[in-house]
Design a protein with these regions (language model features):
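Catalytic cores of nucleotide-sugar-dependent glycosyltransferases that transfer UDP/GDP/TDP-activated
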Residues: 1-487
Length: 487
């Protein structure tokens, strides 16, 4: 099968979140299964042209009512046959940032920028003489691709090409003023005809949902949640209408990077038969975070983006967050790695000055993230919603019992300990009291039933989260998309 991934980001070239990891990991797994996979994305300012191969002759790409000349460069995912093509347009992409910057969180001309990406993807296929079976668009920034395929170019060259749209996070939809519609390079009839109109403006993701042949999201539970009023961000009605083409497919993880048996970033490697070695990792974590070195005290790890979605208010809000109570009333240590909303960063630093058993690193550090996974006894994720989540999976792999809220991918990957079996601890409500109670329950099991706690750790470590399993599910979705256009 020939598969074209259209994306705003892909590791190792550009990354703002888990989407970039998923695109590359899925492409690699599909390639290993024998499929011809290519990725197309913008060449941002920080992607060095000197490390890429120039493709002679620019593309003429629709931009508003005219055309723009777009250069093309080529590379590949490391140690693979997956070609990565970069669309080069200095005005649109030659800037620092994928979607925006710290000072301008959302570039005002993103509709124009990502219309160049989507139109350019099809022009690239023409240039290469390579016509995919599947165009796989990722999130709102690539949502114009299914629209173009269905309403603009489904002629002889792309007559047998189907589209799949993956929603990584429904909270981000690409909503802009109607004034930007001409920059999309499509005729005005598609403002309504392709489902782009939303509250008098443009909603790129809504258009993609309306036009894609198949729609996937990153966990089965999240696929259900986005069809509800509570979890639908205004798209639930449309998603229910299109419910027969919506599938939830769990992300896999890169086991070459996240594997306690081989991880070079932790002080000692281990597996489910040598869990006692986690104590070495725990002592190193306590030392690095300047926590008292004590094997007997359970350590709770937190690695997170400090954003409302992640349940930070329930932990850190000055008037009602439970972190101070948790560290004062339960004999635990807490190791935090994260950055994000300034109020939360400041509150964490304030709490740290009052609590000797809570330490934080504001920012991101790859080696510390691995050490927290390996050295903690528990990993806390009180997310309000979580499309898939990866850290709870890393935690299970590393024998670190996740404490999570029952939502999205967290509900699909963690089994609540019921007294006899389970791989972690689940709570239902997004409240400080619910978080506190779940932590207390988990620590009680750890302290008073070592055999049960070891069984929880081993249950998580025996799970299979490889991308091979996820890739097969995506292939099934691709085949379903192709059947739909055969009708």
């Amino acid at each position: 099968m020939k598969i074209l991934m259209v994306t705003a980001e892909a590791v190792p070239f550009a990354k703002t979140g888990g989407l970039a990891d998923m695109v590359s990991a899925l492409a690699l797994s599909l390639s290993k299964l024998g499929h011809d996979v290519k990725i197309v994305m913008p060449r941002y300012y920080k992607i060095d042209r000197k490390k890429l191969q120039a493709i002679p002759g620019p593309l003429a790409v629709a931009a508003g009512t005219s055309e723009s000349w777009v250069g093309v460069y080529e590379s590949a995912l490391p140690s693979s046959n997956v070609a990565v093509y970069f669309l080069d347009h200095e005005g649109a992409f030659g800037r620092d940032g994928v979607y925006g910057t710290k000072s301008e969180t959302d570039f005002h001309d993103n509709p124009y920028r990502f219309s160049l990406l989507c139109h350019g993807a099809f022009q690239l296929c023409r240039k290469l003489g390579w016509y995919p079976d599947i165009v796989h668009a990722h999130d709102w920034s690539a949502s114009l691709a299914p629209i173009i395929l269905k309403h603009v170019i489904r002629n002889d060259l792309f007559a047998k090409t189907a589209s799949v749209l993956t929603i990584h996070n429904l909270g981000y939809q690409g909503q802009y003023a109607k004034d930007w519609f001409p920059s999309l390079g499509i005729h005005w009839g598609l403002y309504y005809g392709a489902g782009l109109e939303h509250n008098g403006g443009i909603n790129l993701l809504q258009g993609g949902i309306s036009c894609a042949d198949m729609i996937t999201t990153v966990s089965p539970t999240y696929a259900k949640e986005i069809q509800t009023t509570e979890g639908g961000f205004g798209m639930d009605g449309l998603l229910r209408v299109r419910g027969d083409v919506v599938r939830g497919i769990l992300n896999g993880i890169d086991e070459d990077v996240w594997n306690p048996k081989t991880d070079p970033l932790i002080p000692v490697n281990y597996d489910e038969t040598s869990l006692e070695k986690k104590a070495v990792c725990k002592r190193e974590l306590q030392k690095r975070m300047k926590l008292p070195e004590d094997d007997a005290v359970p350590v709770i790890g937190i690695v997170t983006r400090l954003a409302d979605q992640k349940g930070i208010a329930e932990l850190f809000a000055p008037t009602y967050g439970c972190m101070y109570r948790l560290c004062s009333e339960i004999d635990v240590q807490v190791a935090i790695l994260g950055s994000g909303e300034k109020w939360c960063e400041n509150e964490i630093l304030s709490l740290q000055s009052k609590l000797p058993n809570m330490r934080a690193y504001i920012g991101y550090d790859e080696s510390l993230s691995h050490l927290i996974e390996a050295g903690s006894d528990f990993f806390l994720m009180p997310s309000k919603y979580e499309p898939c989540g990866l850290n709870q999976i890393y935690s299970e792999m590393y024998g670190t019992a996740p404490i999570v809220r029952r939502t999205g991918g967290l509900a699909d990957t963690v089994e609540d300990f019921d007294g006899t079996s389970g791989s972690g601890f689940i709570f239902n409500e997004s409240t400080p009291d619910a978080v506190f109670s779940a932590v207390k329950r988990a620590v009680t099991v750890c302290r008073h039933d070592e055999k049960a706690f070891a069984a929880i750790q081993e249950a998580g470590m025996r799970k299979n989260f490889s991308w091979d399993k996820s890739a097969e599910a995506y292939l099934s979705a691709y085949r379903a998309a192709l059947k739909r256009i055969e009708r």
